[in-house]
Amino acid sequence: MKAVRLYEHGDEKVLIWEDIPLPEIKEDQILVKIKAAAINHLDIWIRKGIPGISLPMVIGSDGSGVVTELGRKVDKFSIGDEVIINPLLFCGNCSSCLENKENQCNSMGILGETTNGTNCEFIALNPRNLIRKPKSISFESAASFPLAGQTSFQMLVNRAKLKKTDTVLIWAASSGVGSFGLQIAKLYGCKVIATGGSKDKCEHASKLGADLILNHYIEIPRLEELQD
């Protein structure tokens, strides 16, 4: 199969498009044919070498696809299911996982950083890393939100316990994490103050429903006024 793999860190020229073996699934795994893979800022950090990953590595954390093969112990999915990939790797058995704090798992990892990721034609995954994709969502849209969306949800809902009476400041609201945070906060009925670094980014935050928008390069002093 084809995949994008890193053998060294650097600029875009280090991204190698090549043939690699098709993954063989274990008895508790699922083989997914990738239909869409999104670019996350994490991919840029990994390409540049910031996380210090082991090489070679197939990059990519976010993706969506179709189930093509099932391990003999898998009973929660069927061949042909359209799925969204959860890039967070966790054991499911430690105390953190049992408390639904998978991001604090003792063996926590991320696809495309600690193991081969989604920039390939096929990927072998545990069922806990798959979510059925609603038919109303395209593969491209489904691939765009797992890492950024989960990060925002974890911060606002699981940790901050977001409630309707809250006023939420979303810094850099047009970023991946920021745009999902803005939408999640509005979904919970919160008042949202958003910041952006340009006119276009502020306009994007407005389209997502921000109640008040500040250019964080020139208007941050207004925050003191808002707190009075």
Residue positions per predicted region:
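Nucleotide donor/acceptor-binding cores
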Residues: 1, 165-167, 191
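Glycine-rich beta-strand-centered segment in the early N-terminal region that forms part
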Residues: 21-38, 50-98, 134-136
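NAD(P)H dinucleotide-binding glycine-rich loop of Rossmann-like/cofactor-binding domains
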Residues: 89-172
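Adenosine-nucleotide cofactor-binding segment
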Residues: 170, 186-228
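Residues forming the Rossmann-fold NAD(P)(H) cofactor-binding site
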Residues: 179
